[in-house]
A protein has these predicted regions:
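Short, acidic/polar
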Residues: 29-42, 87-102, 149-152
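Acidic-and-aromatic substrate-binding clefts and catalytic sites of carbohydrate-active enzymes
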Residues: 29-32, 51-60, 84-89, 117-120, ...
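Alpha-helical scaffolding within the catalytic cores
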Residues: 3-11, 59-65, 93-97, 148-151, ...
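N-terminal binding-site loop/beta-alpha segment at the start of enzyme catalytic domains
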Residues: 1-75, 196-198, 265
Length: 284
């Protein structure tokens, strides 16, 4: 399968669409705040939004999208099918609700949120998503929180190949083998929780990250996002603070060049720590 290509604008999926490097994550963005966060993001240049049915805030995201008057073709919108939707009827209902709430006619990327429910159910879910591609409801489909064996199983029957695997990634959990495996399959990997899970107990206050930030005269967040982009991995930082939202998609992030010493120091942080609760994979 052909490798994905990248440019300053973003990384190109196997369907030819360009996914911008930085997305605004909308997980745990509270009602009344997520809309303002989307407005701030779009005003500061974001064109990539990461959403999900289970987040329960897509209607407010959609209101902000409509208010922005940004042409649909300039946006890249991702959402996800939750674990309780696996049959053809359920998947279609979940997708239709996201389309309605977001106020769009199609999705750029539709993901299975977690690989749970059993092999037969996941296969039916995927085949319905393939039909949604055929019908123009989504441009690309993919997965989230999948290990190598999950990906291999999907590839054994997929007619439309997965474009993306969205996983937790940061220096403490780089998942190098999984990232490289997905890339060999022609998939883009995207990073959720690139800072850990917020500043408290996450990565933003880590001494190594702070030292690298001081060395380059940049924010700690820029170090973590720059590390992700240097791996060819788009990142999905979440914030509801306008200044931080703008910082996360700034030229400082895209222009940061980590040197070999920086990369080695960050590699030394790997300890397998996860900051996001992970659903157990059910038996196939």
């Amino acid at each position: 399968m052909a490798a994905n290509t990248s440019s300053r604008a973003g990384v190109t999926l196997h369907n030819g669409a360009v996914m911008p490097w930085i997305a605004l994550g909308t997980w745990e963005a509270p009602p009344g705040q997520v809309g303002r966060a989307v407005e701030a993001a779009l005003a500061s240049g974001y064109r990539h939004l990461d959403c999900a049915h289970i987040y329960g805030n897509e209607r407010e995201v959609g209101e902000a999208l409509r208010a922005s008057r940004i042409p649909r073709e300039e946006l890249f919108i991702t959402t996800k099918i939750w674990n309780s939707f696996r049959t053809d009827q359920q998947v279609r209902r979940c997708c239709a609700k996201s389309l309605s709430d977001l106020g769009v006619d199609y999705l750029d990327l539709l993901l299975i949120h977690f690989p749970v429910g059993g092999r037969r159910a996941l296969k039916e879910c995927w085949q319905t998503m393939e039909a949604l591609v055929d019908e123009g409801k989504c441009k690309a489909i993919g997965i989230s929180n999948n290990y190598e064996d999950d990906v291999a199983d999907l590839l054994s029957y997929a007619r439309v190949k997965p474009a993306c695997n969205q996983i937790e990634l940061h220096p403490r959990l780089p998942q190098d083998a999984l990232v490289e495996y997905c890339k060999r399959q022609g998939m883009v990997v995207t990073a959720y929780s690139p800072f850990g899970r917020g500043a408290r107990g996450g990565m933003l206050d880590h001494a190594v990250v702070a030292a690298i930030a001081r060395k380059h005269g940049v924010a700690a967040s820029s170090v973590l996002l720059g590390w992700s982009l240097a791996r060819g991995v788009p990142a999905l930082p979440k914030s509801v603070t306008p200044a931080r939202i703008a910082q996360n998609n700034s030229d400082e992030v895209r222009g940061l060049a980590l040197d070999a010493d920086d990369v080695r120091a960050l590699a030394g942080l790997e300890d397998g720590a996860r900051f996001v609760a992970f659903f157990n994979h059910q038996s196939r």
